[in-house]
């Protein structure tokens, strides 16, 4: 029995965000940014479960959700909420962040705390894959693979569910 995988890699599947990677207990990158590109692969049900017209679902259903989701991370600072060395204090207008000997203050609407220990492409792709799978499994999507590229030719992908 055959299955089909839909490939979505639109030019507007992108977001620009600032972050820094934490390598170990002494080393971390400086705050910097990337223009990320995203590709999403959706494994559809078996061919017998396609519409009588021979297609799975209108691509626009997926494209709209993916684009809206990526827009949430566009022009924003992404920080790892679960790293033990990250300390956060919310004030009326800002988020104060202490990381080891560094201090930052960001406007509240310009920072997102992610439920991860590092803001690597590995973790970003995993968060997006989990989110897209939760959203799309109701349509019959069997598996989601998300590839996040931070620079041309350099990125990571995650697959949900794994098997």
PLM regions with names:
Residues 1-163:
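Charge-rich, low-complexity N-terminal segments
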């Amino acid at each position: 029995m055959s299955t089909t995988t839909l490939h979505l890699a639109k030019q507007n599947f992108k977001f620009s965000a600032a972050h820094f990677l934490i390598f170990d207990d002494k080393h971390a990158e400086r705050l910097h940014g990337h223009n990320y590109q995203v590709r999403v692969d959706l494994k559809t049900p078996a061919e017998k479960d396609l519409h009588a017209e021979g297609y799975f679902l209108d691509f626009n259903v997926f494209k709209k959700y993916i684009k809206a989701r990526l827009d949430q991370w566009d022009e924003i600072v992404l920080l790892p909420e679960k790293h033990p060395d990250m300390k956060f204090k919310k004030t009326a207008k800002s988020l104060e962040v202490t990381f080891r000997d560094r201090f930052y203050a960001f406007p509240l609407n310009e920072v997102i705390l992610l439920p991860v220990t590092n803001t690597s492409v590995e973790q970003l792709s995993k968060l997006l894959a989990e989110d897209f799978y939760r959203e799309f499994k109701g349509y019959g999507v069997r598996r989601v693979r998300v590839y996040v590229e931070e620079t041309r030719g350099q990125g990571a992908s995650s697959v949900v569910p794994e098997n």
